[in-house]
Amino acid sequence: WAKADSTNAKMLLGRFSYYFTKAQTTEVVSKPGKKYLGMEPLLTLKDSLGNDVYYYQHNVFDDELYGQAIKAADKAIAHHPDRLDFRFMKANAYIAYEKESPDMALAYLFSLIDEDGKRSQAWSYGDEEAEPDFVEDAMQEYCYSFYSIGSDTSREAFRRISEKLSGIYPSNPEFVNNIGSYYLLKHDYKTALKYYNKVLKKHPGDMTAIQNALLAAKHMKNAKLEKKYQAMMAKNN
């Protein structure tokens, strides 16, 4: 197949899938938290002291085979640079491999965002032309992925990509809400409120901002602010 047409998209996708699948083996590991990489535990048992021990299933990669998968992805991208599905294929491979520390994934998505900003022609996804807002919507999904992984490094990636995207898509409140949620997780409620209020100034009916602002106000034990956001919630329900 490769000899007949070395640029064939299905062949290149098949090569990536072969190496990426072959690189992975499944293991069960114990972790102290009730979530790991955004997953619920596969099994919960008690230790000798009666404490819960949580077991999770995750994939371990063979570095050499994983490297072959990335080379296959790069070749697919080189021959089909307009195909977003190949770009996302590589980003997803980085996320799966890096787990709690998605540094390469973040850097790759930053470069893709920058490239998207310079493009004058439409992307494709598979054999179809991608909608104009496809990248914007997909990036919010990656924000959610970084958030869900739940490590300090992934949450920092969540903040950084959300900040970048909020500057590129100023009319989209989701990315500013993301930044507020980062600070809410850090228990910096004052800073979180700053971002939620920034959203509400432009989008007064945004329920995500209202609900999270109310949560921040409750943590601050600020009754006046609680009443303010409760009134906004009642108005928009």
What are these regions (language model features)?
Residues 66, 73, 109, 158-162, ...:
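Hydrophobic/aromatic packing residues within the alpha-helices of TPR/SEL1-like helical repeat arrays
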